[in-house]
Every structure is written in C-alpha cells, then in structure tokens.
C-alpha cells in the first residue's frame, strides 16, 4: 500500500530540490527590487520513492517593504535626565540602534551614518549584520548632528533619523562636544544642586590649585551615558578625576564602579567625595566595614577632621551636617598600599561616634607584579551641601584637594 512520505520543494531561485516532511514553512525570498515575482513548486513522494510528475506551482508577486531604523530605547539622553536642552559630551560618543523589516531583518544589508551633513558623499557604510552601534572618537568641539539610515538588499532605504531631533520633545535640541581642558576632570554627580552652588565652590578650588579654567567639568545629571565605552573614554582623557556626589541621594557613581576601577587600574587618580556609601563591596575601594557616625543625622560645626599627613591640612566642619554619614575601615588585603588621610577627632558633647574613626583613605592596587595602579581616595564627609561649603572652618576645605593634585597624585 502506497504511503505519502514527504515532499520536495523548490523556489525559482533555487538550483536543487529540497526534501521535507513538514506541511508548511516560512521562507525568505531574495527580493532585489521594489516589486519582484517568485514561483514556488512542490511535489509529493511516497514510500516507493515515486515522485509526483506534475508539481503544484504558485506564482507570487512580492512587493518590497522599506526597512526601519531607530535609536535604541534610552540610548540618547532625555531632557528630564540632563535638565536642559543641550546634551554635553567630550570627544567620544557612541550611538546604538535597532533595525526592523517586514521582509525579515536579514534583508537589511547596510547601515549608513553621517555627521553634520547628509550630502551624497558624506555617508559612511557599515555592515548591518556586524554593527548595531558606532563609537565616534576625536570629535571636534562644538555643536553636531548625527544622521543614520538603513538599506535593504533591494536598495530600499529607511527614513533618516537624527540626534538631536528638534521634533522629539523628550530629547535635547542640541548636542555639544566640549573641548578637553587641562588634565583634571571635575565630575558633578549632584543632580539636586540645580543652582550649581557646589560646582562653583569646587571650580573655585580648582581655579586656585590649577589656574583659571585649567580643568574640565562634567555635569552628569540623573543618568550616566548609555554606553559604558563613553564613560570610560571620558575618564581616560584625564590624569586626575575629582568626583563629588549628592548630599541627599540621587548620585550615579555606584553604576560607574567598573569604569572607575578600570580607570584607576590603568594609572588614573581619582578623589571620590561620597556623602552616602551605598555599598561595602566597592570594587574601586574595597571596604572591610562601614558604620554610621551620627545615627541621629547631625554632626555639629566646629568638629575637626584630623589629617594624618600634616596638621596644616586639618579641617573643621563649618556648618551643620544634617544627613547620616559613615566612617569606614578599608579592606587592606585588597590593596597593595593603603594610607589613612583623615580621622574624626575625639567625640565631643552630643557626638555619637566613638574613638577616632577613619573618614578618608588613599589606596593603590597591584595591577601586575611590577606595577601599581593609580591612586583612589575615598572621603565620606561631604565637602558641600549644595548651599554652603561644610569643611571651611579652618581655612578652605579645598586645601585638601590642592594637596591631592599637587602632591599625592604626582
């Protein structure tokens, strides 16, 4: 008794028949024009290997669909995150995208991007199969626009998308590349300080230590760059980084932990003034333990921070610290070298800590048998609260930053 075993099928673009036992299938056809015509043939085979001599045939006119391309969700900054209409970056910027095509993403063959101009010779071609992002380096300072489009195997192109796009109200209207000034980067991770009072204080400190505007400033906002490549590139433009965080939360430094560690491991020096120690397992500054100095949320003015380097660097709290802060003990086994820089003075009336807890240390890692990392300094007492400086009771607290830049980091 004859029994159906399977089928042989072939498209007109195929040179051989293909055997299958399936009774349905999804096929990709290589459409190469706006409208193309394909024929499909199929014939049955039985258990005596007899093949239907008259294959069934269908002719299909197929219209090509244009591809679409979009920037990946949240890969460009939002107005809400940056708090303004301009996105500022340094000379490295990564763009990330996703493509779609009703005919199948495999029909998309090319991605094209352009910077500032969409003339016919301005586009750079990328393989759609190999690239879903591009990192632009050595960008010239000033305003820029990035353009992007996709092309499929039939030559159909997507609509051009761009960043910035004035028609997108959720994204900034301008993208401005900042020049690299000096070898020191000031990182403003204090999003609540909308008036930039803390930033102005740090700027004045760096003006005194390094000379007027002989440094660069990066104001992060609510979110770090989408691409970790951009964050690392920004840090690596500089020899030294001064990173200060919010007085009452909202900082981003913990999400940058790996970038900070890699920066230090590569030889960079960083000072982190962190009001809130979010984690005791910082890879950039391993801690054995941390503990709250003021469970009631107050440290009064005139309390002293005692320098372990020189009494000329002693600091005095100049205004009430009205948030809980921590002392800490570094995990010395994780450092090649570790040095205490500041401790709290003995507690006075109303103080809640005991002894002289450490609130600032400097460490280095062993990155190879013969090489140490750059230096990482952690300080857990805030230097500014967004309204007034907090450590200016014995001369400017900036003398400590000046010491780091001129002595410790050299």
Predicted regions located by residue number:
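Short, solvent-exposed loop/turn segments at the edges of extracellular beta-sandwich modules
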Residues: 45-51, 151-161
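Short beta-strand segments within Ig-like beta-sandwich modules, predominantly Fibronectin type-III
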Residues: 16-25, 122-130
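Hydrophobic/tyrosine-rich beta-strand signature of extracellular beta-sandwich/beta-rich modules
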Residues: 38-44, 144-150
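Extracellular ligand-binding/catalytic regions of CAZymes and related secreted enzymes
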Residues: 350-410
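A glycine-rich, often tryptophan-bearing local segment used as a flexible ligand/cofactor-contacting loop or short
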Residues: 247-345
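Helical hinge/lid and interdomain linker segments adjacent to catalytic or ligand-binding clefts
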Residues: 194-282
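Solvent-exposed loop/turn segments flanking beta-strands in beta-repeat/beta-sandwich domains
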Residues: 1-13, 100-118
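Surface-exposed, short loops/turns at beta-strand junctions within beta-sandwich domains
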Residues: 29-37, 136-143
């Amino acid at each position: 008794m004859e029994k159906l075993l399977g089928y042989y099928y072939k498209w007109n673009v195929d040179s051989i028949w293909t055997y299958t036992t399936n009774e349905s299938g999804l096929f990709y056809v290589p459409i190469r024009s706006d409208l193309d015509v394909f024929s499909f043939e199929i014939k049955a085979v039985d258990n005596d290997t007899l093949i239907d001599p008259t294959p069934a045939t269908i002719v299909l006119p197929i219209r090509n669909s244009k591809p679409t391309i979009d920037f990946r969700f949240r890969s460009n900054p939002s107005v809400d995150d940056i708090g303004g209409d301009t996105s500022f970056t340094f000379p490295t910027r990564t763009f990330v995208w996703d493509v779609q095509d009703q005919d199948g993403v495999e029909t998309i063959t090319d991605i094209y991007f352009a910077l500032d101009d969409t003339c016919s010779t301005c586009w750079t071609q990328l393989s759609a199969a190999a690239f879903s992002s591009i990192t632009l380096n050595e960008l010239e300072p000033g305003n820029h626009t990035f353009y992007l489009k996709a092309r499929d195997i039939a030559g159909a192109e997507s609509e051009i998308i761009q960043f910035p796009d004035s028609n997108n109200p959720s994204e900034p209207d301008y993208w401005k590349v900042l020049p690299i000034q000096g070898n020191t980067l000031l990182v403003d991770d204090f999003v609540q300080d909308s008036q930039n009072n803390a930033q102005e204080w740090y700027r004045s400190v760096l003006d005194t230590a390094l000379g007027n505007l002989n440094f660069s400033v990066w104001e992060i906002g609510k979110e770090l760059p989408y691409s970790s490549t951009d964050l690392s590139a920004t840090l690596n433009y500089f020899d030294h980084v001064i990173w200060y965080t919010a007085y009452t939360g909202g900082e981003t430094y913990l999400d940058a932990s790996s970038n900070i560690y890699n920066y230090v491991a590569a030889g960079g020096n960083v000072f982190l003034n962190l009001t809130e120690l979010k984690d005791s397992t910082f890879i950039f500054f391993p801690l054995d333990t941390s503990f709250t100095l003021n469970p009631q949320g107050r440290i009064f003015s005139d309390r002293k921070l005692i320098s372990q380097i020189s009494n000329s660097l002693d600091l005095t709290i100049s205004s009430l610290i009205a948030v809980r802060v921590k002392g800490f003990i570094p995990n010395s086994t994780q450092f090649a070298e570790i040095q205490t820089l500041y401790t709290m003075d003995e507690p006075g009336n109303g103080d809640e800590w005991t002894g002289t807890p450490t609130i600032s240390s400097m460490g280095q890692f062993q990155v190879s048998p013969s090489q140490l990392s750059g230096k990482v300094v952690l300080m857990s007492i805030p230097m500014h609260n967004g309204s007034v400086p907090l450590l200016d009771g014995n001369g400017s607290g900036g003398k400590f930053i000046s010491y780091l830049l001129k002595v410790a980091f050299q």
